[in-house]
Amino acid sequence: MDRVYEIPEEPNVVPISSLEEDVIRGPNPRFTFPFSILFSTFLYCGEAASALYMVRIYRKNNETFWMTYTFSFFMFSSIMVQLTLIFVHRDLAKDRPLSLFMHLILLGPVIRCLEAMIKYLTLWKKEGQEEPYVSLTRKKMLIAGQEVLIEWEVGHSIRTLAMHRNAYKRMSQIQAFLGSVPQLTYQLYVSLISAEVPLGRAVLMAFSLISVTYGATLCNMLAIQIKYDDYKIRLGPLEVLCITVWRTLEITSRLVILVLFSATLKLKAVPFLVLNFLIILFEPWVKFWRSGAQMPNNIEKNFSRVGTLVVLISVTILYAGINFSCWSAMQLKLADRDLVDKGQNWGHMGLHYSVRLVENVIMVLVFKYFGVKVLLNYCHSLIAVQLIIAYLISIGVMLLFFQYLHPLRSLFTNNVVDYLHCICCRRPRPERVENSETSCEADTTQSIV
């Protein structure tokens, strides 16, 4: 994931005096090329083009059923992507007819990408010049094991470019879990029952798989940023690689199991899958109603109660879509302004993976014993074992990340080993000592990443 700015190591920053706490003055932020925006736009255009191509092929072959579902998944995710970009950029309150028209014809990500490129070129030409409009941003940072508070100036142009990046991160998650996941699952199902994989369908499945993996990786990064909003977080290549491997194994094994289960039971599998999704969808609302809390009214200052309700419903649908295929890396909390529980939530993570593992084992057993007509030329037992092993490996890689590679693992009250000791050895969890300086709060916690 590319960064908007970078903070150098401790010797390059200058401490300044403060009556309340020591603040280190950071250098002027350095902007980088927005690769993530280009990549997200490429995935959107590639998946859209391949989906429309398959719709044309299905229509030509009079396969109306397959054509309808392929087009429906494409349209739903595309509309949600346009609404996400409009919401983040607040276009409804601005006079921007060209942007709204491009969103209307489902080309909003393309025009937004061009705007971001123009903004980057403008910054590149003005590099070294001071901007007249700047704001101060403060973040905590761990340097050599010590927690320090860093302050730096952020120009208006860099903040605008950062807003584009944030919008595309959220767009990629919407596209991944509300469009690519159902599209990939359905195309796998069609390939399985038709016993053929034409080039167009293979390209569509490839774009969908890359989109899902990228969206899940971003989901982890955004979860870390939201939970530790006061901290400047760095994720190195090894951490990103670990997250990508974890998510790829988790999602592919889960989706293949769902496809084999659906191909085995046909329509009989629909009630199980729908019930599974509805439980995830209504679980945050049940907790919200049981808590007796009021609906948050400060999500967006210009929103009415109806607008707030629409946002909450949309977020809940996205949350359910993520948890249906993989772990969301955060727990939804509708009564909170940030809509997420910022605790570590080891229990929530353990419950999710335990339930999903049991579900996967049950679906694999159904495929093994009843899927005689699905894959006649393959050993069902070998396929079942490989899928379960792949899912277990993904859990192992996830535990490895939280134990050794999490950027702020030193702030954990308990880590993975503590919980394994508690569960396996039946011993009380040893409480790790928190950093004594974590109570130091920044005056300004506005985040631009």
Swiss-Prot record:
Q: Which domain of life is it from?
A: Eukaryota
Q: Where in the cell is it found?
A: Membrane
Q: Which residues form the signal peptide?
A: none
**InterPro entries in alphabetical order:** XK-rel, XK-related_adapter
Keywords, A to Z, come to: Membrane, Transmembrane, Transmembrane helix
* Coiled-coil ranges from the UniProt annotation: none
Please classify the protein's predominant subcellular localization into one broad category.
membrane
Q: Name one GO cellular component term.
A: plasma membrane
Question: Which sequence ranges are marked TM in the entry?
Answer: 35-55, 68-88, 98-118, 174-194, 204-224, 241-261, 269-289, 306-326, 357-377, 382-402
**Its membrane topology:** Multi-pass membrane protein
Record-stated family: Belongs to the XK family.
Name of this protein:
XK-related protein 2
The record lists the organism as Mus musculus
- The gene is Xkrx
